[in-house]
Amino acid sequence: MRSAQVYRWQIPMDAGVVLRDRRLKTRDGLYVCLREGEREGWGEISPLPGFSQETWEEAQSVLLAWVNNWLAGDCELLQMPSIAFGVSCALAELADTLPQAANYRAAPLCNGDPDDLILKLADMPGEKVAKVKVGLYEAVRDGMVVNLLLEAIPDLHLRLDANRAWTPLKGQQFAKYVNPDYRHRIAFLEEPCKTRDDSRAFARETGIAIAWDESLREPDFAFVAEEGVRAVVIKPTLTGSLEKVREQVQAAHALRLTAVISSSIESSLGLTQLARIAAWLTPDTIPGLDTLDLMQAQQVRRWPGSTLPVVEVDALERLL
């Protein structure tokens, strides 16, 4: 006997969260809970404003139609990435094919303060990895901040994310202020320039390795080994089903590229599932999941160690 619930939710964000020049005041999304006999599976559907093609309102109508079809015994594939991902997680939990083991190590997001980062890294076992957003301020400032962090913490490796913010000139201005002796400790810089060709040129000219992120979701992207490209950053909410995520990870690993499972600012429920996916598909890589503290609450499932209050399922708005 099948049953299902769909919930709508909204979480207040911290004041300083900006996505593509838009301030994100709340994180909005949906949960689906599928039950069959004694088994249960949850999934999160939370399109990311400015990045997802679909809105959560569009996702809601498609999800409700899919759930009603599932209750009637149908299980067609979904095209919208956020729904395909959330539904595939719920189905995987229902079938017990999403392993429980999780990688809760997260590369902490750094605001540029080395003292703050040293405190965050003090309890981090093994490799010291942190992430810095660049491209929000002047490229010269970004270069100075990155250089300061690498100088202050000798065993630090940084992941940088520019979100295609730089022209070739700005990329050169950034690199000019990063000591060439430190550049090998930049694990990768995600999408430094507005075009892939400019990003490739940046890697060649600076010796700083790059990673593809947005490029993975473009129709002409192909997995090929390229000089200067070290990693791919996979955001499942923007990618699609678990099967598609696994295919991308396998394609990256076949080329000896690092594959990083990364957050699209999901709620704690979605983040705990991403931690399980990371442990399953990329067990040797620290995922990019340090986004929970951008929110003012957790929901349904707790992230280990978080002190944020937890909103239980009874407090959510039920749609079905």
UniProtKB/Swiss-Prot annotation:
UniProt-listed InterPro entries: Enolase-like_C_sf, Enolase-like_N, Enolase_C-like, Mandelate_racemase_C, OSB_synthase_MenC1, OSBS_N
Reaction catalyzed: (1R,6R)-6-hydroxy-2-succinyl-cyclohexa-2,4-diene-1-carboxylate = 2-succinylbenzoate + H2O
SUPFAM superfamilies the record matches: Enolase C-terminal domain-like, Enolase N-terminal domain-like
EC number: 4.2.1.113
Record pathway: Quinol/quinone metabolism; 1,4-dihydroxy-2-naphthoate biosynthesis; 1,4-dihydroxy-2-naphthoate from chorismate: step 4/7; Quinol/quinone metabolism; menaquinone biosynthesis
UniProt GO BP: menaquinone biosynthetic process
One Pfam family matching this protein: MR_MLE_C
Similarity annotation: Belongs to the mandelate racemase/muconate lactonizing enzyme family. MenC type 1 subfamily.
Name used for this protein in its record: o-succinylbenzoate synthase
Organism: Shigella boydii serotype 4 (strain Sb227)
